[in-house]
Amino acid sequence: MYELQPQRVIELVLGSSLLASFGIVSLMSLVARRYAFPRILEGMIAGDFAGSRLSETCAELCKKMNITGVNLREATVGNAFCLDNKGRKVVAVSPELVSSMSPAEVEAVIAHELSHLKNKDSREKGLARLAKFAFVFDPVLHLVEAAVHRERELLADQSSVKYTQKPLALASALLKVHSAFHASLPGPGAGLFVGRKGKGLLSRYPDLDRRVQRLIDMAREMKTQTILA
């Protein structure tokens, strides 16, 4: 006669529950990307910058970075962000951000967002987020998801510097966006390029001081290399 083993039953139930949760979240993610994404996107962007100097800057960066099919649009939410869904690539920046920054700063911001597209960060962040929601009771995955997001932001900073050679422009842009947000000013401080204030393991954005210091260090290193060359 088969003997019931409580521990084995618990393992089977938990395993089945986790698989079911992961399957449901995966399905929801697929449906959202296919049907909800276009509507959400249209609510976050307005007209394009066709024919403007900004559009030319984006095109030049795309050529340098070997990225195709990018549409530069005005952001109606946040200050600057990028989205990639089934090959539809969008970089959006707010008119307020553009008007408050120098051309070099805007170029550095666009390069940062293009770097997310080039590095396929939507996929990396999406996988981390999917795991977090599928295993919602696992605190480690919440830390992992936040860590992945921070790491991809730092990588995008580094990539922006690689293609623009303007680390101080990016540092200045970060400080301007951060200042506008914490002064409760309208426009570019809405918080997608820098993110809300927060430190620690659960913060999805790197510490601002750390980001700026890294960029200053890059500028010093570039200056040293120029002198030695």
Where are these regions (language model features)?
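Hydrophobic or amphipathic, alpha-helical segments that drive membrane association/targeting
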Residues: M1-A75, N79, F135, H142-L143, ...
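Residue-level signature of catalytic and energy-coupling elements of molecular machines
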Residues: F37, C58, V93, H112, ...
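An active-site-proximal "capping" alpha-helix that borders the catalytic cofactor pocket
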Residues: T57-C62, R150-K166
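Active-site-proximal gating segments in proteases and membrane effectors
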Residues: K64-V90, L141-L143, V161-A229
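Short pre-active-site segment immediately N-terminal to the catalytic Zn-binding motif
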Residues: V93-A108
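Active-site His/Glu-centered metal-binding helix of metallohydrolases
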Residues: I110-K118, L155, S159
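Catalytic Zn2+-binding segment of zinc metalloproteases
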Residues: L114-A131, L168
